[in-house]
């Protein structure tokens, strides 16, 4: 592996370089020869090499043009990925040549500074994917997989758990990266749910969740006061107890609340 390229702090780059960890990630992602794989932010190709050894159809989306020559050189012995030099947030997954309409496996060491926008984009593309395996800050993964009544349970937990079965499958120490980040990392697995509770208005559901967690220490009654007043709704008629805080409600509770208020 060549590591000639200096990591760019502005892009949140931390290059993975531990071969054992990389092999473990690919193994956990259960990638087969026939799978269509998209890697987000391949960097210098440490993970890409192993993906090319596992699948016949690997595409990479890399925003930083300066790493692409090194990426190609590092992958040469393993194969050639389809390279898209663009921002994943603007990337159209359906633009991939895929005559069989086969669903896609997403994988990547996500830049810390834009991990949340990427996750919200993946929500929009959830009908096109089999699963996703992302390396993120461990703290972020813990928030995503958190259950109600915990301090780390929040907006990200509710929204992602509505769409996916979410699990933390591997913890990763800082020492396996170049340069070393100041935080621990973890692998998040997202598997789209086969069936989701029906929502009357998804955008309104997102807004209710956002408002409910706006001030964590306040009750739902206080956080949703303006919405309840605008709709002239008596809080006692709601399907949830508004004296609770948002962190006490399950994903299903938020669905019921949003549907009632829609």
From Swiss-Prot:
Lineage top rank: taxon: Bacteria
Chain residues that bind S-adenosyl-L-methionine: 14, 16, 41, 62, 87, 109
Subcellular location: Cytoplasm
Molecular function per GO: 16S rRNA (adenine(1518)-N(6)/adenine(1519)-N(6))-dimethyltransferase activity; RNA binding
Top class in the EC scheme: transferase
Broad class of where this protein is predominantly found: cytoplasm
SUPFAM superfamilies to which the protein is assigned, alphabetical: S-adenosyl-L-methionine-dependent methyltransferases
The EC number(s) this enzyme carries: 2.1.1.182
Annotated Gene Ontology cellular component terms: cytosol
Annotated Pfam families: RrnaAD (PF00398)
Swiss-Prot/TrEMBL keywords: Cytoplasm, Methyltransferase, RNA-binding, rRNA processing, S-adenosyl-L-methionine, Transferase
Record protein name field: Ribosomal RNA small subunit methyltransferase A
Gene: rsmA
